[in-house]
């Protein structure tokens, strides 16, 4: 435990948490077991608020320092040399919200709990809501319950879920009572959907058919991934600073291993940090006092955890909201003060880094040779297999999609079926069923890589897999956007179908070449970034006792600069990061034969998801420009046809590809508010899109 931190005295009052009695949380009827209106008494809630205040008091100084360092990093990158090999594909800068999914399910809920029909909705922001029936949802009624999907794990095996539940309270297995709702859980559920969270109550759903279960599984997994990596995907200085501050704060508490604690929003991350710190003491104090046995006690435990989590999350959210004005003012001030002095700051940083590198070279090289070098080749190769297989699956799907368009253009001059193909092609990055092939490839090496990384304290496999999956989706989105842009530029109304198909085939070749270049660059970034995540905390922990003792003698040089953007600890970590990255690059050259693998300082500072121009906000429409309207003119759409909206949607890829179109592009004048379902209905009935047939046609 860190300084000023006390154990949470929550043992008193936990006798009241009894499965099958009491009431659930207001507005959330999701728990299988019941609980009193508040499992925590006033004193316990006050104590938790004190714990959150202590966390913020210790964390915010780290955050302020990292904000300054992040602004310096951003300015130096803007002013420094650019990468010789940049992205070839056009950037689809902002990924969309998850597709909304809705339908009937049954849920284990109520007091006493029983399986009851509900109407469930996965919102575009990844939030899950459930209603008493469909009409309640359609009429804008209040939901029975809702939850953000951050941190949940989805299980579709009832046996696996029961084993997980039993593991929560293993000491009480076999002690069954009439209170325990085992009969409800052990009645076979044909198509279950169990959502489990380490600090929150579990959600038990069941679908009516295997097809419905499969569709919900894909949708829920997409929502979990979307909400989990919102910070990692952002390139805003504040997001990068926050993640670095969390890592430094935990290192100061003695935790050096990387794990999945940084999944979620900033408030959710801080909540997870505090919950992990307090969980052992909380478990020791409260479990003996919980009534019930077996799974009844396990459910009571999740109820209590949920109450603690809610209290901590509320406090963390309030604290970060209160800090927001100061953060905005600090960022503006840092920009004004750092930019004029950036050259001086970087020169001083380089001088201190050179001296530090000389001082720690001996123990650092010894640690790398002894601990890192023997495992590095296997880690790099496994990381490469993980991302390479996923991106190869993306390439295959992309090529098939472009081939279908060319084939349809040759075979269907009426345009109705072609219009469907254009729409489907634009939707590929967000088609969960289609992209599942790529996502599965990212999962295949999880076990092997986890075994290799665990000795170094790395437990963030879920974050790593999410990163590979997100990379696959981003590259697919970029490639689709590029193809549609180039098609816009090369097609004219003077072409017949065969000529147009030939031009699309040439575009296909160009896009695949660009994709090959970008996927190679993305693989190297992925391996370098995650290699650092695996090895850097371990090396820092190994050097902690000796090398950090040398840092105070450099404080004078750093303080003389008079900027909080430079700290001896930050420069020290950058030196170690740079040496590690040299090792990783050498191994990459052996594995890939990549002569252009660079080891610039900017590269050393990169994190796994960092990509040029990546969007800080996942829920905004992309700013990808439309280019010319020749593609749409070639398809001969009347200006006010409902099919115009279809093409707009296909190029937008569910309203997420582009928004900054030419003002005279008539295709995009139709308001997107018409709705996706209406547009799909007009596809099959609209017969306009006529083409000039070739002579043989």
Swiss-Prot record:
Tissue and organ distribution: Specifically expressed in B-lymphocytes.
InterPro entries, per the entry: Niban-like, PH-like_dom_sf, PH_domain
Superkingdom of the organism of origin: Eukaryota
CDD domains, per the entry: Niban-like
Signal peptide (from-to): none
Annotated stretches, region: Disordered: 1-48
Family statement drawn from the similarity comment of this UniProt entry: Belongs to the Niban family.
Name of protein: Protein Niban 3
Organism: Homo sapiens (Human)
